[in-house]
Amino acid sequence: MPMLIQNARVIDPSQGLDKVMDLLLEDGKIAQLGSNLPAQNAQVVYGTGLVAAPGLVDMHVHLRDPGLTHKEDVYSGCRAAAAGGVTSLLAMPNTKPAMDSPETVRALLERAQTADAAVYTAA
């Protein structure tokens, strides 16, 4: 079912766009942007106070995975990131063991394959 988000702030730096408008979503993708779009057969969401923007990138994330997963792990960290609009993140190497070898990096990236955000690593 299509979804119409009315009166959300739409930000798209690539288009120089920053204004309140309606978004029509079809199959999970933006099909149309505009003002006063018709709601025909669409679920209506009132977007006042909401922001629609490209996914954000967090360049400094402590996933603590491996070794300190009682604080955070790939899945909880990515879930929290996605809830805040972050679609990509850079994981710091402060883990136990330290993420300082190809093996530990590969292991983290393998676990991240099914996470809610794209994970990259730093050293």
Set out the residue ranges of the language-model regions.
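Metal-associated gating/positioning segment near the N- to mid-region
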Residues: 50-113
